[in-house]
From Swiss-Prot:
ATP binds at residues 83-90. Transmembrane segments: none annotated. It comes from the Eukaryota. Necessary for the expression of RuBisCO. This is Protein CfxQ homolog.
Length: 305
């Protein structure tokens, strides 16, 4: 049996006994570095991380098949990310763009995030130029369309979203070797969107569902957010923040990690106000970096109870 090195992938060197060191090939792609970053940046989401690893493994194997002159399945790369706001969809999309670039499936590796407003015009003849300009900027990378279902408004005959969808469909089919599209949004709304637009559904081969975070995971996220800004939460503060999270999860417009970031920002503001009002004493570094339980307890969520 002969082991093929990187410079020896020539047809005359390949036979059914050719060996490929998959770990060596995997290491050369540097994909593991991206996956490690994903683990570091996102708490939990194990099903999502496993799905991304599966997609990466399939793409790597397809690349090796090409090198060994085996038929390529021509994997569909367009994706659907479904889940509530604040569950890490944009972060994962960024890492997915990195993986696709490292494996050579896209030229540039950039991620362009857009919504309906970036694609759909307000009058006749306005939508096509807007959509085409966005697609031009996205070429060679990944186009991430958040809340994609807002492109389709069947109850409004004068809506131009369908025009944007038609242009998008053409590009997803005809230029799929130079652009990957990720459609994202709430799961139930995305399912209805696909039912109403079977052309889009047929072009999406990778579906990734993002579960909501647990209260404990959101506490970890909150602590991590504070540590990134060089703040510390007291032990009592951690207990209060967990209680805040449990209450906030039952309130309207809860957005997972996004809501926690907002809560952290407000706690920092209350901490600053508390410190300012006690400015008749000399402050220490510990004073400046410590978030106390009272900085969270002053939230209206506790005042109403």
């Amino acid at each position: 049996m002969n082991v093929i090195t990187e410079t020896e992938y020539k047809e005359e060197n390949i036979n059914e006994n050719t060996l490929v060191n998959i770990q060596e090939e995997y290491k050369k792609t540097k994909i593991q570095e991206v996956l490690n970053q994903l683990d570091k940046e996102l708490i939990g989401l194990t099903p999502v991380k496993n799905r991304i690893k599966e997609i990466a493994a399939l793409l790597l194997i397809d690349k090796l098949r090409i090198k060994l002159n085996l038929p390529q399945a021509n994997p569909g790369l367009h994706m659907s990310f479904t889940g509530s706001p604040g569950t890490g969809k944009t972060t994962v999309a960024t890492k997915m763009a990195d993986i696709l670039y490292l494996l050579g499936y896209i030229r540039k590796g950039h991620l362009l995030t857009v919504t309906r407003d970036d694609l759909v015009g307000q009058y006749i003849g306005h939508t096509a130029p807007k959509t085409k300009e966005v697609l031009k900027r996205a070429m060679g990378g990944v186009l991430f369309i958040d809340e994609a279902y807002y492109l389709y408004k069947p109850d409004n005959e004068r809506d131009y979203g369908s025009e944007a969808i038609e242009i998008l469909l053409q590009v997803m089919e005809n230029q799929r070797n130079d652009l990957v599209v990720i459609l994202a949004g709430y799961k139930d709304k995305m399912e209805r969107f696909y039912q109403s637009n079977p052309g889009l559904s047929s072009r999406i081969t990778n579906h990734v569902d993002f579960p909501d975070y647990t209260a404990e995971e959101l506490l970890e996220i909150g602590i991590m957010m504070l540590e990134e800004q060089q703040y510390q939460l007291t032990e009592e503060g951690k207990k209060v923040l967990l209680e805040y999270i449990k209450r906030r999860m039952t309130q309207p417009h809860f957005a997972n990690a996004r809501s926690i970031r907002n809560a952290i920002d407000r706690a920092r503001m209350r901490q600053a106000n508390r410190i300012f009002n006690s400015s008749n004493r000399v402050l220490t570094k510990k004073d400046l970096v410590t978030i106390e339980a009272e900085d969270i307890l002053k939230s209206s969520l506790f005042m109403d109870k």
